[in-house]
Amino acid sequence: FVEVSEAMSLDCPPGSAEPWLPLIDASSDRESFDKRFPEKKPDDVINFLIRDRLNPNSIISCIQLARENARQIRDVLTTEMWEQINILYWNMQEGEAIWNKPRQEQLSEIRRACQLFYGITDATLSKDLAWRFSILGRLVERADKTSRILDVKYYLLLPSLDELGGVLDELQWIALLRSAGAYQMFRKAEQNSIKPESVARFLLLDPIFPRSIRYCLDGISNTLKMID
């Protein structure tokens, strides 16, 4: 989400929070944010989403909760999984080197660490009931994230109706695809120019892209059948 708004901010006046506020809307945290940050500065939005421990949906809060959940089921996890979630948790504490890096590098490092955890889980955890529940949770999370990414675009208002289908509109759709890790696979599936209906169809209905809502729902259904 943050990376989408990072790209969109280039087309807005310096200091404008307009490209960032859709992130707050999409995460349903607008009321809480407005009460605490009435001036709505871009840095306030970014810190609220990434490092704010009072925001239960911030990245750092989610990782803290994930580590606590992992601690409670420590006997189910492999040592490698526990080590990885701890590395991510401790690397995100105040004063750590990650916070001295540019914002894009911070986000990339966090994303890679999360992807590494998924890879370690698939490589080290026996494919038993615990693994199936982890897959179920992952698919639910992905479907929710993709729907929220589409919400971000809904809230990203264009300067005027004349911009619909224009350069700025296309840039927003490209940024949205990249935020879902879907740009390259979309271009392989759709040879024509980027159109809103094509992007929405791909992210909602593509049967083989692992982050499309259809793929996730099919996976959820199949996993529930295996659990049953």
Identify the residue ranges that each predicted region occupies.
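Alpha-helical transmembrane segments and their helix-helix packing motifs
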Residues: 1-228
